[in-house]
Amino acid sequence: MGHKVNPVGLRLGINRTWDSRWFAGADYASLLHDDLKLREHLLGRLSGAGVSKVLIERPAKKPRVTIYAARPGVVIGKKGQDIEVLKKELSSMAKADVSLNIVEIRKPEIDAALVAQNIAQQLERRVAFRRAMKRAVQSAMRLGAQGIRINCSGRLGGAEIARMEWYREGRVPLHTLRADIDFGVATAKTTYGTCGVKVWIFKGEIMAHDPMAQDRRAAEQAPQR
């Protein structure tokens, strides 16, 4: 079962928690659609900033958005101009005053979402897929990952028949619920069609039953801006 399901969803409530954190009654559907719009807007607008995830909280009807990015300077802009413009855009979309936080990702090489995005960008630039995968695996293992697996699928290298290629190094225990496994997906839009990239990164085991464990680990690595 661990090989079939999304490893993030499988571990929710064990060592992972949700990326949208709020409670709602009758307006649940509208708030969920607002979250989806905010995420889509941010990921599209900040494509050059290396955004890994967007955390949305709604304390007292005032949305609080936290952006986890590898290049926070791109988000903030010169003298904080860009972040103010972004805050106004989000406030008009959410129809409420939005507070915005930026958290820097110090080691993008072991962040699954960023690794997947990087490989997808290389595939779009016609870099050989095996070279891109091998380089990502070596970087992740060098920076402390205990295991990594990468899947690339589609018309790889412009082949007539689509196929799936994978590369793995170290341990990636998908069935072990206490395993801290980061998972990311990305799509490369090539001239031959789309290619899918999936990345699993094993960072160690979290022995305690702590849904906030991964967030706490990220907060220890980087100060908020």
From Swiss-Prot:
Matching CDD domains: KH-II_30S_S3
GO molecular function list: mRNA binding; rRNA binding; structural constituent of ribosome
S-S bonds: none
Matching InterPro entries: KH_dom, KH_dom-like_a/b, KH_dom_type_2, KH_sf_prok-type, Ribosomal_S3_C_sf, Ribosomal_uS3_bac-typ, Ribosomal_uS3_C, Ribosomal_uS3_CS
One GO CC annotation: cytosolic small ribosomal subunit
Superkingdom as given in the UniProt entry: Bacteria
Gene3D superfamilies reported for this sequence: 3.30.300.20, Ribosomal protein S3, C-terminal domain
Pfam families, per database record: KH_2 (PF07650), Ribosomal_S3_C (PF00189)
Any one biological process term the GO annotation gives: translation
Keywords carried by this UniProt record: Ribonucleoprotein, Ribosomal protein, RNA-binding, rRNA-binding
Domain named KH type-2: residues: 38-106
Oligomeric form and interacting partners: Part of the 30S ribosomal subunit. Forms a tight complex with proteins S10 and S14.
Similarity-based family: Belongs to the universal ribosomal protein uS3 family.
Functional description taken from the UniProt entry: Binds the lower part of the 30S subunit head. Binds mRNA in the 70S ribosome, positioning it for translation.
Name of the protein in its database record: Small ribosomal subunit protein uS3
Organism: Acidiphilium cryptum (strain JF-5)
